[in-house]
Amino acid sequence: MRCISPTALVTFCAGFCISNPVLAQGLEAGVGPRADCEVCKEFLDRFYNSLLSRGIDFSADTIEKELLNFCSDAKGKENRLCYYLGATTDAATKILGEVTRPMSVHIPAVKICEKLKKMDSQICELKYGKKLDLASVDLWKMRVAELKQILQRWGEECRACAEKSDYVNLIRELAPKYVEIYPQTEL
């Protein structure tokens, strides 16, 4: 058997990684941790951290009850994730066990989401909308539908708004209340 020098081994491995397009693909700048299963990872991480901070018992049944409660407050893309998991009242399928069992033994959210992706690819297709910085955006240049979306995400509604100026004034009035809670609003 031949002995290989460490530099020859490193050179061989580096050449192999660069020549293999599948391995080199992960080295691209565009591939980031948020690129895949973004909603699933962030939602389950937040859920797991809330369980830890409240000192909840990590049994599958307890986690399932807490997940149902957590999903009852979810809105937007996170509500859609809860629907796919079966944690909403109108859900067609129920795969909560695929979340609660692994989480009861402290498996990271990334691994849980990868497993869920194999079961239902729609779960990882959910993406958060682009972020909107209310301090830098000109509300007058936005469409009324976009202004309504901002209010909807905040859980507010303007029944008396007839013109664009009414929506803009209401958003500016409510912004201090919600900018502290939601530093950047999704559009």
Swiss-Prot record:
Organ and tissue specificity: Expressed at high levels in the heart, skeletal muscle, testis and brain (at protein level). In the brain, detected in the cerebral cortex neurons through layers II to VI. In the hippocampus, detected in the CA1 to CA3 pyramidal regions and in the granule and polymorph layers of dentate gyrus. Weak expression in the striatum. In substantia nigra, detected in solitary cells that did not express tyrosine hydroxylase, a marker for dopaminergic neurons. Relatively high expression in the Purkinje cells of the cerebellum and in regions of the brain stem, including the locus coeruleus.
Record's subcellular location: Secreted
Record keyword Disulfide bond present: yes
Signal peptide: 1-24
Record's keyword annotation contains Disulfide bond: yes
Cystine pairings recorded for this chain: 37-124, 40-113, 71-82
CC annotations in GO: extracellular region
GO terms, molecular function: growth factor activity
InterPro entries (alphabetical): ARMET-like (IPR045333), ARMET_C (IPR019345), ARMET_N (IPR045332), SAP_dom_sf (IPR036361)
Keyword list, A-Z: Disulfide bond, Growth factor, Secreted, Signal
Family that this chain belongs to: Belongs to the ARMET family.
Job description of the protein: Trophic factor for dopamine neurons. Prevents the 6-hydroxydopamine (6-OHDA)-induced degeneration of dopaminergic neurons. When administered after 6-OHDA-lesioning, restores the dopaminergic function and prevents the degeneration of dopaminergic neurons in substantia nigra.
PANTHER family assigned to the protein according to its UniProt record, in alphabetical order: ARMET-LIKE PROTEIN (PTHR12990), CEREBRAL DOPAMINE NEUROTROPHIC FACTOR (PTHR12990:SF9)
Name of the protein in question: Cerebral dopamine neurotrophic factor
Organism in which the protein naturally occurs: Mus musculus (Mouse)
